[in-house]
Structures are given as structure tokens and as C-alpha cells.
Amino acid sequence: MEHMKETSVECELIVYSKLNAMGMEALTSVGKSSENPPCMLVMRYRGDEEAPVTGLVGKGVTCDTGGYCLKPAGSMMGIKGDMAGGAAVAAAIYALAANQVKVNVTGVIPMCENRISVCAGSGRRDRFLWRKED
């Protein structure tokens, strides 16, 4: 959002509590076990009052380990790739605004981590560890 400050793009960050109130369970369910709560970024660029509004939506999963169903080690290399759609939407809107293109675009980026934090669930680390008693 820092780069958008130098443009006419209006940015709105929808936080976890509002996402819950809106019934956005798909997003909040994926991200609720992470230390960083899910959110959604809405960007509005208005370059022409007469033009229709085009919508762009891009997935912004910033870290996808697979949650409780962990991915195999070999596929962990691409865990940041699930944010590529969101990055493309943000870049497109920035480019449109920076070049003052005569269009109207709204971009939506639902963002979360699909990663289990140490404090997920009961908040106890030993919930995820098995112990062998001698």
C-alpha cells in the first residue's frame, strides 16, 4: 500500500473482525491458525468518470505450508507463489494509476497465511508433539 500513496488509488484494508461479520468464512478459516490474521485489500482506481468499472481479484496467500495437511519438503519451495495473483492485481492497478489510464478498476486481494502458528488451537505447543514416556 505504500507505493499506492503516490497515486490516486483509494485503498481499504478489511480486517479479520469485519471479514467475520461479512461471512467471509473461506478466507477466515484458512488463515485463522496463523499468527497473522487474514485480511482483504480493496483498491479502487478511477481514471474516467464515464467508464464502467472492471474488477480484478487475485489470491494473496503469502505463505502456504498446507496447514494441518503439510506439503512434502520438495514442494515447500513455492510456498510464496500463492500470492502471485494478488501481486499481479496490485501491480496492474499501480501501473494503470501511474500512467493515468482512462479506466475504472477495483482490485480485491484476499490475504492470509495457510500456516499453523505455535499458538494455534489451545495455545499449547505440546498439543502438536508426541511424547514417549520411559
Task: Put a short name on every predicted segment.
Residues M1-D134:
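A generic structural signal for tightly packed, nonpolar segments enriched in small/aliphatic residues
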